[in-house]
Design a protein with these regions (language model features):
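Preference for long, amphipathic alpha-helical scaffolds in soluble/luminal domains
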Residues: 1-282
């Protein structure tokens, strides 16, 4: 757990799910119809899937596709804007883009404006919300916050140094925002924010759930906090009798293919749950 084997990573491009994803790459270097359309077969979500597969970060076809996005879809506010340069960029989308663009080794200069855009959209309560620059949201979203946190983590893990102190502060405050909600509860009522976020889904896409949050926290090296415990207990209760975890739900949309079926035991969720419990379970 937690150890990448470069020789296996190289094989992902020619075998199994990784080879399947790459086979859908169009001749001009993209997937689907456009960068963000349709969900979930667009370039954006396919690149995110490939990153999560831990395919070699040196894959040149993937790097070329990301460079095309950087060269053609930068918005006037510095982020990636699939809907036109003058349209306001989406925080959640740019958090995810930063995640895989960092993993696949884009030049730091190409990512600086995305960092600037994201940091400009920090909310007063510590997190992020994709509606902060459109309809004037005043409370952070767990969905946007986890996407940006994952992007910041991959950016720093990949050795980039641009605005590191600002990113560390944003990371700290965003983690605190999630912990204030015990990872899934309203900070006002203590009730579950939304029943969907306690379901184990994969792929997560842009959507938050407790396993995605816990896996981020273990990956970021965050120390155990008692406010994680309710989510950890929920995760352990979802374990099947054979020791694995299921896919409890799928996010509707077009897919290139189904890696796993809802209701079945899941290799993805089992791997992620084991990583979480290895770090946080006594």
């Amino acid at each position: 757990l937690g150890i990448e084997n470069p020789s296996l990573q190289d094989r992902i491009a020619t075998e199994g799910w990784g080879a399947k994803f790459l086979s859908f790459r169009r001749s001009e270097g993209h997937w689907g119809q456009r960068f963000y359309q349709p969900k979930w077969i667009s370039s954006h979500y396919t690149l995110l899937d490939l990153k999560h597969l831990a395919i070699s970060p040196d894959n040149q076809a993937i790097r070329q596709s990301i460079l095309q996005v950087i060269d053609t879809l930068k918005g006037s506010d510095g982020g990636i804007s699939p809907f036109g340069a003058e349209q306001k960029c989406d925080v959640c989308l740019n958090g995810m883009f930063l995640n895989y663009a960092s993993y696949f080794g884009m030049k730091e200069d190409n990512l600086k404006s995305i960092i600037d855009f994201l940091l400009t959209e920090r909310m007063k309560d510590g997190g992020f919300n994709c509606h902060s620059n459109t309809i004037g949201a005043t409370h952070s979203s767990v969905h946007s916050t986890i996407s940006v946190l994952e992007g910041i983590l991959e950016f720093t893990k990949s050795g980039y140094t641009y605005r590191r102190e600002d990113l560390q502060n944003a990371e700290k405050e965003s983690i605190e925002f999630l912990l204030q909600h015990n990872l899934y509860k309203s900070h006002k009522t203590g009730e579950i924010i939304n029943k969907k976020i306690v379901m184990l889904s994969y792929p997560s896409r842009w959507k938050y759930d407790i396993l995605r949050a816990l896996d981020y926290l273990q990956n970021a090296g965050v120390r155990y906090d008692p406010r994680m415990q309710d989510a950890l207990d929920l995760l352990k209760k979802k374990r099947l009798k054979d020791g694995r975890w299921p896919v409890q739900a799928k996010h509707p949309g077009q897919t290139h293919f189904d890696m796993e079926q809802a209701g079945d035991a899941s290799r993805w969720n089992t791997l992620r749950a084991l990583r979480v419990l290895q770090r946080f379970d006594d």
